Amino acid sequence: MKKSVVIFITAVCLLITGCGDTGSLSKLPSSSFHEDKQKLTIMHIDADNKRFQDFIEETEKKLDMEITVEKCPSNADNRQAKISTILASGDKNIDLISVNDEMISEFKHKGYLEPLEKNVMTEEVRDSFPQKYLESICEENGHIYSVPFQMDIMMFWVNQELLKQAGLDEIKNTGDFDILQKSLKNPDQYAYGDAWENTHVYNSLSQFVNFWGGDYFDWTDPKTKDAARYMKSMLDEKNTSPAQFVDQYEQMEEKFIRGKYGCVFMYTSALGTFLDADVYGKNKIHMAPLPVLHKKKATNIATWQYVLNNASENKDAAVRFLQYAAGYEGSTEYAKIMKSYPARVDVIENEDIDLEGIDMIRKYLREYTLNARPLCENSMGAVSDMEKLFQGYVLGQCEEDSFFEQAQNCINTYY
């Protein structure tokens, strides 16, 4: 009996004192392994998207990291206001934020963001993204302030059923717009649809300037003037609807889906909307080559991007995440899980990437010049002022020469 008690006491002592490394491990709390993981908080436009949640889950495993995702406001104005407040106030709770072109064009001037050219967007990585776009949107004074992760290309979309009704296989030039319009049977149908609401019209105006080979920053250029003249003529000749002055992309897409428009210019992000509405297909709504309006073939692109909050206390973790997201492997995983076009051109060109409409995307990348939109530090002011001038012009409320002069003054003021 005494021998048993001695053995029991000895065993208890061994458990308490431990031996070697066993003692040090026994003193750690059960959650210690999780506490050793790097932590990261991302405010993201796709926080509620199940596919993005899957991407984050896979990334956590890959990087052995604990990532919290917070939602952005869905309204564009509210979103920009909230993110601006977070950055300006030095809020340390958000490390990475997803921003669009309008936001980065403002924030990169403010000192809110961590430069990324030394440890993330190195020269080798940078070469895999559209170069002119990076220079125009992501860079300032020799620094790169963002990592693009999703590409949006301004595509030409057609309703093939309405084209067939007009006896057209495709729209090749301005004459085909007229043919299409004459074939439409209802007074509320138009050959061309657009979104000319005050925060959207600059997309279209700069796009048409691209088609004519003009320069959005030079309103003395005859080609720039011709682009604006043609947009006015489309309204005058009723090839497009006056109702679109109050339409944003959501309303334009809805009308396009309902067969009100024969064709539109819209970003690739609309693909999901058309798929969900079951109207996407080669004999329905689909992406098409650009009409030939000028020998220079160009279109606008935009991206969603990550920026690193300068006030972040988790910069090491943030940089690791950005290195993965900017790299070939991370960008490929993003494309496959999200079913979305990544910002890296080499990943889009990878034949292993099988996304809806990818062949047309590759055609645009190979055959057309990709232009960044005309944005500046005060993009909202520039966009709003140009919209007012353009609306007055196309509605006949100001003379042509006056519009061109005021448009140039607007450019000189903001850019």
Please name every model-derived segment:
Residues K61-K62, K71, S84, H143, ...:
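Extracytoplasmic/periplasmic substrate-recognition and gating elements
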Residues H34, I285-A288, A335-K388, G392:
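Long, aromatic- and glycine/proline-rich binding clefts that accommodate carbohydrate-like moieties
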Residues L63-P73, D91-N93, G167, S233-Q248, ...:
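A local structural motif
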Residues D95-S98, G262-Y267:
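Paired acidic/hydrophobic, glycine-rich loop segments that form the ligand-binding mouth/hinge
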Residues C72-K82, E102, T174-D176, Q244-I257:
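Short helix-initiation/N-cap motifs at beta->coil->alpha
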Residues Q181-K185, F217-Q248, L290:
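Glycine-centered hinge/linker elements that transmit conformational signals in sensory
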Residues L28, D101-M154, D178, N186, ...:
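Hinge/lid segment of periplasmic solute-binding proteins
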Residues S4-V6, C13, C19-S105, T122-E124, ...:
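Conserved N-terminal structural module of periplasmic/extracytoplasmic solute-binding proteins
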